[in-house]
Amino acid sequence: MAKAKFERTKPHVNIGTIGHVDHGKTTLTAAISRVLSERLPSNTNVKQDFDAIDSAPEERQRGITINISHIEYETEKRHYAHVDAPGHADYIKNMITGAAQMDGAILVVAATDGAMAQTREHVLLAKQVGVPYLLVALNKADMVSDEEILELVELEVRELLSNHGFDGENVPVVRVSGLKALEGDQKWGDAVMELMKAVDESIPDPVRDRDKPFLMPIEDVFTITGRGTVVTGRAERGVLAVNSEVEIVGIRPTQKTTVTGIEMFRKQLDEAWAGENCGLLLRGTKREDVERGQVVVKPGSVTPHTKFEGKAYILSKDEGGRHNPFYSNYRPQFYFRTTDVTGVITLPEGTEMVMPGDTISITVDLIQPIAMEEGLGFAIREGGRTVGAGTVVKILE
């Protein structure tokens, strides 16, 4: 069966839901899907139920559904790909890759609870991984009858956003009830439409880096019987046409191959554009030749490196960081794009130790090469938790 072609008629925006566990991220995602499918019916606005969205991250990862917990929908203005980032601490790694894919995010805060630990953690992570815009869905608003409480929660969330470098004063805060909207309640359906209007208006059309050389970090790799190996990820920049030659850079020696097919939301494309989640079919490449953490690039545009100077912020104990200082030769993991690589930190002369809460210049020696450019962001992690975040300032070798 020939696949339907993906039509590009509206601006495409990647968004997602973030926030504390059980505050209703997935319910709200399902509600957006339902309300839009009823009020703006189209080929794109197909209702996705809660269970399908909720089970996406784990179960379907090994199937051939490209784009794991992404759903697509459209407003009158735009086409959206929406990723539902699960809320548990052990999903933080997914959150880092998921959040890195967002042009903006809906921070879901239950009006019944207010901001909680993971609310703060997700806002901090959103800032670190460069989610440029947030807006707030004050969820479960049907369960709070006291206007003062709603106002207090709103103030608290605005303050939290301001403290983390977002524009807390001007961020839209929309009162919603994902559950009631999902049940078909007219009033709360209107609230979901109001939320989507706020998303349309407060998250600017992303400036896509289409003119730069193509780069896509690999998130997943699988085999499609009879066709070959597919790598999936979000194109960070550039445009890639079918039958183009590419290089796969990082972790292993650089290899050349040809992209023989491109698909997105199970539809065939002639080209992959910056900002799109897609799967690339690679000619003559075996499943074991490529892995998560490598990047697919225009030949000659990016090189692998192991040693760099970076600027990093080390999280304080209160932010969930380390409780004690570290010294030269500290060996954490450096999380670049989609993978962790161990690296050895050397502190600048005259700096004996680094305290939680410090901002510091470091030299890092990675045990495996990573496709790297100046300005590339990374997280510093240890034992599965983020203890710092930084940027590559200068490549040394």
Curated annotation (Swiss-Prot):
It is an enzyme of class 3 (hydrolase). Coiled coil: none annotated. PROSITE patterns: G_TR_1, G_TR_2. One of its GO terms (molecular function) is GTPase activity. GTP binds at residues 19-26, 84-88, 139-142. Disulfide bonds: none annotated. Residues 63-67 are annotated as: G2. Gene3D superfamilies: P-loop containing nucleotide triphosphate hydrolases, Translation factors. It is found in: Cytoplasm. InterPro entries: EF-Tu_GTP-bd, EF-Tu_GTPase, EFTu-like_2, EFTU_2, G_TR_CS, P-loop_NTPase, Small_GTP-bd, T_Tr_GTP-bd_dom. It catalyses: GTP + H2O = GDP + phosphate + H(+). It comes from the Bacteria. One of its GO terms (cellular component) is cytosol. Its main location: cytoplasm. Residues 84-87 are annotated as: G3. Residues 19-26 are annotated as: G1. Keywords: Cytoplasm, Elongation factor, GTP-binding, Hydrolase, Magnesium, Metal-binding, Nucleotide-binding, Protein biosynthesis. Residues 177-179 are annotated as: G5. Residues 139-142 are annotated as: G4. Mg(2+) binds at T26. Its EC number is 3.6.5.3. NCBIfam families: EF-Tu, PRK00049.1, PRK12735.1, PRK12736.1, small_GTP. Belongs to the TRAFAC class translation factor GTPase superfamily. Classic translation factor GTPase family. EF-Tu/EF-1A subfamily. GTP hydrolase that promotes the GTP-dependent binding of aminoacyl-tRNA to the A-site of ribosomes during protein biosynthesis. Monomer. This is Elongation factor Tu. It comes from Tropheryma whipplei (strain Twist) (Whipple's bacillus).
